[in-house]
Amino acid sequence: NAVENIAISCELIRSHVLHLSTDFVFDGTAGPYKENDQPNPLHFYAESKLKSEEIIKKNLTNWSIARTIIIYGITDNMSRSNIVLWAKGEIGKGNTINVVKDQYRSPTLAEDLAKGCISIIDKSAYGLYHLSGPKTYSILDLVYQVADFYNLDKSLINPVFSASLK
């Protein structure tokens, strides 16, 4: 287990480890969530992130965990996508996209996440933190904002319920 090996090695040198996690450790039925709310992961990715958090807590003295939500921003060479770039790209190509209208998230600008992580390390702030953007949007509203910002055709956005994507 990579996380366990890293945690054990870092504990040997008393390193402060900052582990990035996700809001997916929650089931999404009662947000926004606080750090002490009970996780309830619904799929493998979420379960693996929660297990990693538990490994960090068990094996380290100096640990911080930062749970974040929908990281977005411009990437070098567009080498990695995010919801903003995906929506811009697909609508920009004239493709119709299905976007959930019943999920709400607080998207996080990558630069803001980096500043939050630096602050945690600089202040030796140990424990569990939720780092996200200041506003909560439906995924649909977020994608509509992307379309508005880039002056794209919003008629290509097809609102759907999450259950229809399963």
Question: Where are the language model's segments positioned?
Answer:
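NAD(P)-cofactor binding segment of oxidoreductase domains
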Residues: 1-18, 50, 55
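Mid/C-terminal beta-alpha module of Rossmann-like enzyme folds, strongest
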Residues: 116, 123-166
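Active-site "gating" loop of Rossmann-like NAD(P)-dependent oxidoreductase/epimerase domains
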Residues: 20-43
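Short acidic donor-binding/metal-coordinating loop in glycosyltransferase active sites
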Residues: 22, 68, 133
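Catalytic tyrosine of NAD(P)H-dependent dehydrogenase/reductases that use a Tyr as the general acid/base
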Residues: 42-45, 102
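NAD(P)-dependent short-chain dehydrogenase/reductase
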Residues: 54-105, 111-112, 119
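Active-site YXXXK catalytic motif of short-chain dehydrogenase/reductase
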Residues: 45, 49, 67
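Hydrophobic residues in well-ordered beta-strands that form the structural core
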Residues: 18-19, 65
